[in-house]
Amino acid sequence: VESYKGMHFACFDPDAPSLEEYLGDFRWYLDVILDNDEGGIEFIDGNIKSRLKCNWKFPAENFVGDSYHAPWTHSSALIAMFGKQPTMRPDRSYHANANGHGWEFGLDFIGNAATLNSPQILEYLREHEAKFAERLGKVASLSSANVFPNLSFLAGHNTFRTWNPKGPRETELHTWVFLNANAPEELKKEYRRGVMLTFSPAGVFEMDDGENFENCTAVNAGVVTRRQKLHAGMGLDSRIEHEELKGNVHQSQINEANQRAFYQRWADLMNAETWADVPVR
């Protein structure tokens, strides 16, 4: 059992690498949400458990690289909340991955926190933007991430979840809400309410995603589909070098670089006899 910035991780394999080695460069990205304030984080009371008729890899894949599904999957909810679709900027957004862990993000500090529909939350973020930037650096945005294999974050919503397999076609989802420990009590209520609105079993976005996860699992179980190869080639030539960002960095959120890295890591582990056989990517 080891911990990182207030989160505890456990593994039954005595030969597994240390948590520091396992996370690798991805620790830099986790600090954006776990260590942007000197007081650290705390969990808001309660968690949500629900089940989906899907393979666990579908939701994990969605969080490792989230943005290109959003404009049509969540179109009705986004228009209802904002009156229009948000604008995406490929030139100001990225995919980044390390050993199958993935983070996708843009340079808008508010990011997807805007969907929480809370003026108090937006005011808090704007007031603290300079402080967070001083602590972490300017490139510290709010979007989605997945720690391989099945721990996902929505940083702007301050929620994280685990996708627990209950067989090849069923997943149990556990969801928590967290916040900086120094944040006002009223703000904690706002985040809880915002997550219930957006990413709970009855939330306006979670219901959309659940339809995708379940229907993709069902369709891909078909005989004809299983005979074919699926294409995940978006952004094949998008790799860049970035002076601030860690790991394997790709230009644009509209990408499948992180999805490819996720499945490569899964294949590496499935094919390896021991941890020594698992390559560092």
Language-model features, listed with the residues they occupy:
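C-terminal catalytic domain of Rieske-type non-heme iron oxygenases
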Residues: 3-281
